[in-house]
């Protein structure tokens, strides 16, 4: 626990202290946000606000992770060094953040709403996602556990949904596809949620906070300890909890400057990097489907865009919402930006609570704690 506390505080301090320095750096170079003309009129005042703040969040994550492990080693705390799971998850996070950085930098330098072309962004994300998936199925520990498994998971692996049903080679190929689908879904979900001051930052912090609890619980109920009923076959759960704690702290530190009126935006650097991190946590903690519940707000926002675009094409130009994503619909209905953000945070908290309840309920059922219910 001391490791999680040190990591979380370090992430918070590095992010909170580093963000204003980064703001000055961006302002000095004129790196400001480009605002679309067809967006809500209240957003016109956001034009020129420094962006790419995700670089501070991700940078704080990496730096705090390395410093924490170093400090724990010096203090003689038996926490273990950086693990394969931790390093591979960081690779995915940093890789996706890099794609977002290129996209942000292109928008800023060319002063347009389109950065990378959709095809270019998809290709870069697929390359990083594929590298992540392949690495995640390697590096077995002393029990033979790799960071990821080929089984599709809900609150844990589902044995009868193993993608390696036709052999290891087919399993790897299908897992690469499945992993890329998850990564694409989470990165786009965070990206679409990042439209109002502090919305995506706060919502993501709630989800990563949930992954601190999930990973901690998996560590305490690991099959490596006693192999009791309902135990978890997860590699490096404590290191995953550390990363989740650091990222939560980094997000809260950034939120101090990102809350309304925002002094800086996370940009695609942040949204894609955070989406990559959420995908990594979901895959490594064997909660690939459950993450859709934890991130229920982001799922709803993403669906609002899909529904809007789909109905617009089918109906010949009609719209379901005043504007998509969903948060802008409520803005146009007259809700103040802060009102939308706080109410959406509450919805996100509800989703996270339901997700954690499902996760714990799954374990409880396997202990025989819910009579008449089978896992």
Curated annotation (Swiss-Prot):
Q: Where in the cell is it found?
A: Cell membrane
Q: Which residues form a coiled coil?
A: none
Q: Name one Pfam family in it.
A: MraY_sig1
EC class, as a word, reads transferase
Give the primary localization class. Answer: membrane
The family note in this entry says:
Belongs to the glycosyltransferase 4 family. MraY subfamily.
Catalysed transformations (reactions):
UDP-N-acetyl-alpha-D-muramoyl-L-alanyl-gamma-D-glutamyl-meso-2,6-diaminopimeloyl-D-alanyl-D-alanine + di-trans,octa-cis-undecaprenyl phosphate = di-trans,octa-cis-undecaprenyl diphospho-N-acetyl-alpha-D-muramoyl-L-alanyl-D-glutamyl-meso-2,6-diaminopimeloyl-D-alanyl-D-alanine + UMP
Its keywords, alphabetically, are: Cell cycle, Cell division, Cell membrane, Cell shape, Cell wall biogenesis/degradation, Magnesium, Membrane, Metal-binding, Peptidoglycan synthesis, Transferase, Transmembrane, Transmembrane helix
In short, the EC number is 2.7.8.13
Cofactor(s) listed in the protein's UniProt record: Mg(2+)
This chain's function reads: Catalyzes the initial step of the lipid cycle reactions in the biosynthesis of the cell wall peptidoglycan: transfers peptidoglycan precursor phospho-MurNAc-pentapeptide from UDP-MurNAc-pentapeptide onto the lipid carrier undecaprenyl phosphate, yielding undecaprenyl-pyrophosphoryl-MurNAc-pentapeptide, known as lipid I.
Query: What's the protein here called?
Result: Phospho-N-acetylmuramoyl-pentapeptide-transferase
Classification from the root reads: Bacteria, Bacillati, Actinomycetota, Actinomycetes, Micrococcales
Q: Give the pathway annotation.
A: Cell wall biogenesis; peptidoglycan biosynthesis
Entry-linked InterPro entries: Glycosyl_transferase_4, PNAcMuramoyl-5peptid_Trfase, PNAcMuramoyl-5peptid_Trfase_CS
Q: Does the keyword Cell cycle apply?
A: yes
Q: What does UniProt give as GO cellular component? A: plasma membrane
- Which HAMAP family has this protein been placed in? MraY
- GO biological process entries: cell division; cell wall organization; peptidoglycan biosynthetic process; regulation of cell shape
A GO molecular function term, named singly, is: metal ion binding
